[in-house]
Amino acid sequence: ARLEDDNFLDFNPEKLINEEAADYDDSQFPRQWVQRTDSGELTLDLRYEYAPTAGIGGARTDAAKRDGVAVQVPILFLNQLSPEPFRWQIPGLRHELVTALIKSLPKAIRRNFVPAPDVARAACAALEEDYSPATDELIPSLALVLRRLRGVVVEPEAFNWDAVPEHLKMGFQVRNARNKILGEGKDLRALQQQLHKEIRSALADSLGASDDTMAKMVALAQGGSGGSGGSGN
């Protein structure tokens, strides 16, 4: 039975948007991610999934793997990607990510950067002005920015990436030519190792390889030099 308000039970997606979202433009939550590789640029689709109860109590469920933003990666390109550019996240989640990283610092260091959300906002502005996901690693860049803001030396090793909430870590969904998900998760390197046989098979299929060329393809599939940078579009 419905209440007097006929729309009471209807889902309103706007309720999921925080107060700051009104100030965002589409570039804050892009539909695609542009990744630089040694062979050129890859444009990868992004998928957004909202699973606020994922991983409650420390459980690593399938929902936890999907909570947040996930890059859609064709299996052929999996070994061309490097994890570092993806740590920057999309612009719309970067402030929350930087806040979480500041809160992950040991207490003796963290007390120099309070309130964390305000420091994170200033840090994000500096990161956007002076650094780029395409050329710079997030953690060392953030350490330098925090030192500039507060005059306190922060070693990159002081940040605890494992303490960052799962939804703030970029996810990856690896798909075959039929768009079937072959593997997914937050750890790109683990996926590359887990799917090395699938990578080899996809390369062989795409190139129509004979046995004489398999050795070269195996070396490519296992070597995966990795891309140098990327960013959300």
Predicted segments, located by residue:
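A positional "C-terminalness" feature that preferentially activates on distal terminal regions of long
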Residues: 1-233
